[in-house]
C-alpha cells in the first residue's frame, strides 16, 4: 500500500518551551539547629547518616514544621510568618547549622513524647561523618560512642549544654542562639549549599541575632541579583549606635537588605513582615503601614525613632487609635523595599520573556522587522510591570504632553554596527518611571469665619 504522505504530508513542530520566572514571593528562614527531619523517640537511635543530606524543607503551614520536629525560636519564627493575613502559601526553612561551630541547648521541661518520665531530653546530631545520639536522665547524658564528650554542661547556666555537632533531632530542649559558638566565616558557604539544593526562595531571614552572622548574610545577599534579606535589629544592645545591623547595611549602602528594630526578645518581626508582604504581587505593595500578627509593637521614644530612621531602619509601633503598623519601609540605602523588589522582578520578567521568545522562533532577523519583534516583547514585559503597579500609568503633564510610563527605544539599522550584526548582538534601550507609594500625608487647611 502506498504511503498517504506521498499526497498529504503533515508535520507539526511544538514551540512550547517557556523560561521559568523567578520566585519573588517566598521567604526562607535560615535556622541553625533546624532539626526538621521528623525523628521521634522511637526512631532517633536507629537513624542513619544518609537521612540528613537535605538542607531544606518547604512548608505550607506552621503545624507541618512542628510535626517535623522544629521547636524553640525556629518554630516561633515559622509561626510568625504563617500568622499573617492573608497567610502566605509557602515558606522554606534552611538548615543553617554550619553557621555555628557548637550549638547551645537549654532544657525546657517539656516531656519527650513517648519516652519514660525519667528521660528529660533527647538529641540526635551529626559530627563529621557520624550520626550520634544521646538522652538525658536529669543528671547525665548517655548514648552512642562519643556523645558524652560532645555534650558539655554550661558552667554559667544550669540546664544548658554545648553540643559539638549539627543537631538534627531535639526534644525536651531548645536551641539557645545567643549562647552558641558562631562561625561567621562559614555563612556564605552555608547559604550557597542550601541554594544549590533548592533555589526557589527570595527573602532570607534568620533566627540568630548574632551580628557577625547577620552581616555575613547581608554581604551574601547583596551579591545576588534576585534575593533580598530582612533582619531583626536588637535595639537594646549597648553598642547599637556604633555597631548594629541597621548601621551596617546603611553604612555599606545596601539595597538588598533592610532591618526592623525591636527591644523585645523572641519578637520575630522579620518573619512577620516577610509573611505579610511577600504574598503581594511585586509592584502592588508597600512595606510601610502594615499591621502584623504574632508580633509585639515597640514603645520607642521620638528620639529612638529618629535614630533608627536616620540609618534607614524600620519600626513596628503603636500610633494610637488602633493603628499599630510598620514604618517607613526602607532598605539600607534608603530606597523603598517594594521598589527594590519590583526592579528585581521586572528584570527577571523581561529576561525570561525574551528567552521564551527566542527559543521558540527558528530565527529573528537582524533587521527592522526583527527589532520590532524584540521591542514588542520588551514592551509586553513592561506593560506587565505597569499592570502590577510598579510603573506609573501614562499621564498628561501641565503642558499637555503625553508622558508614557515606559518607553522602549527602537534601534535603527544605522545604529547597529556590522560587527554586532555578524555576532548577532543587539542593544535595545528602555526606561520606565517607578510608581512610588504614598506613606505620609500633610493636610494643610484654613479655618475661616464667614463674612470677614
Q: What are these regions, as identified by a protein language model?
A:
Residues 1-452:
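Surface-exposed assembly/interface segments
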Amino acid at each position: 500500500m502506498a504511503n498517504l504522505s506521498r499526497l498529504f504530508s503533515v508535520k507539526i513542530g511544538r514551540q512550547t518551551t517557556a523560561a521559568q520566572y523567578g520566585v519573588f514571593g517566598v521567604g526562607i528562614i535560615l535556622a541553625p539547629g533546624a532539626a526538621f527531619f521528623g525523628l521521634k523517640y522511637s526512631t532517633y537511635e536507629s537513624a542513619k547518616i544518609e537521612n540528613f543530606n537535605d538542607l531544606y524543607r518547604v512548608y505550607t503551614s506552621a503545624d507541618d514544621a512542628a510535626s517535623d520536629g522544629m521547636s524553640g525560636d525556629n518554630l516561633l519564627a515559622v509561626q510568625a510568618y504563617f500568622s499573617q493575613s492573608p497567610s502566605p502559601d509557602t515558606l522554606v526553612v534552611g538548615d543553617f547549622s554550619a553557621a555555628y561551630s557548637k550549638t547551645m541547648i537549654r532544657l525546657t521541661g517539656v516531656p519527650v513524647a513517648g519516652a519514660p518520665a525519667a528521660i528529660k531530653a533527647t538529641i540526635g546530631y551529626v559530627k563529621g561523618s557520624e550520626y550520634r545520639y544521646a538522652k538525658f536522665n536529669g543528671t547525665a547524658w548517655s548514648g552512642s560512642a562519643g556523645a558524652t564528650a560532645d555534650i558539655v554542661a554550661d558552667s554559667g547556666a544550669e540546664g544548658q549544654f554545648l553540643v559539638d555537632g549539627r543537631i538534627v533531632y531535639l526534644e525536651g530542649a531548645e536551641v539557645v542562639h545567643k549562647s552558641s559558638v558562631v562561625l561567621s566565616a562559614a555563612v556564605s558557604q552555608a547559604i550557597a549549599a542550601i541554594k544549590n539544593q533548592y533555589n526557589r526562595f527570595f527573602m532570607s531571614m534568620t533566627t540568630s541575632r548574632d551580628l557577625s552572622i547577620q552581616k555575613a548574610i547581608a554581604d551574601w545577599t547583596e551579591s545576588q541579583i534576585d534575593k533580598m534579606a530582612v533582619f531583626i535589629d536588637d535595639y537594646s544592645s549597648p553598642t547599637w549606635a556604633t555597631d548594629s545591623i541597621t548601621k551596617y547595611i546603611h553604612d555599606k549602602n545596601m539595597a538588598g537588605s533592610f532591618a526592623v528594630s525591636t527591644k523585645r526578645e523572641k519578637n520575630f518581626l522579620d518573619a512577620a513582615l516577610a509573611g505579610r508582604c511577600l504574598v503581594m504581587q511585586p509592584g502592588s505593595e508597600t512595606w510601610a503601614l502594615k499591621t502584623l500578627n504574632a508580633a509585639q509593637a515597640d514603645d520607642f521614644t521620638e528620639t529612638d525613632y529618629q535614630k533608627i530612621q536616620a540609618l534607614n531602619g524600620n519600626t513596628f509601633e503603636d500610633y494610637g487609635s488602633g493603628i499599630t503598623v510598620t514604618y517607613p519601609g526602607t532598605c539600607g540605602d534608603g530606597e523603598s523595599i517594594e521598589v527594590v523588589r519590583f526592579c528585581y522582578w521586572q528584570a527577571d520578567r523581561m529576561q525570561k520573556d525574551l528567552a521564551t521568545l527566542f527559543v521558540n522562533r527558528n530565527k529573528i532577523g537582524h533587521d527592522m522587522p526583527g527589532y520590532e519583534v524584540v521591542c514588542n516583547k520588551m514592551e509586553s514585559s513592561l506593560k506587565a510591570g505597569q499592570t502590577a503597579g510598579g510603573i506609573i500609568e501614562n499621564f498628561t503633564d501641565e503642558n499637555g504632553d503625553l508622558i508614557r510610563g515606559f518607553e522602549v527605544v527602537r534601534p535603527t539599522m544605522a545604529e547597529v554596527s556590522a560587527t554586532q550584526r555578524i555576532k548577532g548582538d543587539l542593544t535595545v534601550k528602555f526606561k520606565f518611571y517607578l510608581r512610588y507609594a504614598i506613606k505620609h500625608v500633610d493636610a494643610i487647611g484654613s479655618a475661616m469665619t464667614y463674612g470677614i
